[in-house]
């Protein structure tokens, strides 16, 4: 994601670090094959995580989350407003919220079974909420005895679900509006379809691209720390 922040900055200012007229698919494929570039960006992420963690719980992690989480919500809202106001974005909203619409309109061949839905949602739930990983034991060791655990648990679940819905509203409407044939899932949705969307927004596209990929960087760093 740091790579794509740099890419959009390059496109915004016409610098050499931009896409330089290459197709988004070629940019993504080239990055996957470029081991040196992957190592560099990986090290940048590791160093960034280390610097935050070295600040301790209150001076590093809490300070970052205190700034990063509000910034994440602001960037999400900006991207949602832009995505949902694009011509054709309504099809993305129908895909997300209208049962049977995707099958009826040929977006997907057939609806997944209830067991597939439960399996996918359950896997995401366990991963997103860090259930069964021992993470809560680690976090719990830093909590004050006056903390209301039940209230915090409910709040975490509600906010996690809200952010997931907001992320969907940020991505899916844009895909249907500006890249209707783009991938609907996996890394290609993030790095090919969404970059296509930003490339087709015109002059403001790189700005929204920078905001979007910074948003993903914030989310990744908050998970890594």
Question: What is the role of each PLM region?
Answer:
Residues 1-58, 87-119, 184-191:
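Inter-helical loop and helix-membrane interface segments of multi-pass membrane transporters/permeases
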């Amino acid at each position: 994601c740091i790579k794509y922040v740099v890419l959009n900055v390059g496109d915004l200012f016409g610098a050499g670090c931009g896409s330089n007229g290459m197709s988004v698919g070629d940019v993504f494929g080239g990055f996957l094959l470029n081991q040196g570039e992957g190592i560099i960006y990986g090290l940048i992420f590791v160093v960034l995580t280390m610097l935050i963690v070295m600040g301790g719980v209150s001076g590093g992690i809490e300070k970052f989350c205190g700034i990063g989480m509000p910034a994440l919500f602001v960037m999400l809202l900006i991207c949602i407003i832009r995505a949902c106001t694009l011509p054709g974005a309504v099809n993305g909203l129908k895909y997300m919220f209208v049962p049977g619409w995707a099958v009826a309109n040929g977006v997907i061949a057939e609806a997944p079974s209830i067991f597939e839905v439960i399996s996918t949602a359950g896997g995401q739930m366990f991963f997103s909420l860090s259930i069964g990983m021992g993470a809560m034991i680690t976090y719990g060791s830093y909590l004050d005895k006056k903390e209301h655990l039940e209230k915090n648990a409910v709040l975490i679940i509600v906010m996690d679900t809200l952010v997931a819905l907001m992320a969907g509203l940020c991505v899916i409407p844009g895909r249907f509006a500006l890249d209707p044939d783009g991938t609907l899932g996996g890394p290609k949705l993030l790095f090919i379809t969404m970059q296509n969307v930003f490339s087709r927004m015109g002059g403001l596209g790189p700005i929204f691209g920078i905001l979007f990929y910074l948003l993903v960087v914030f989310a990744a760093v908050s998970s890594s720390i």
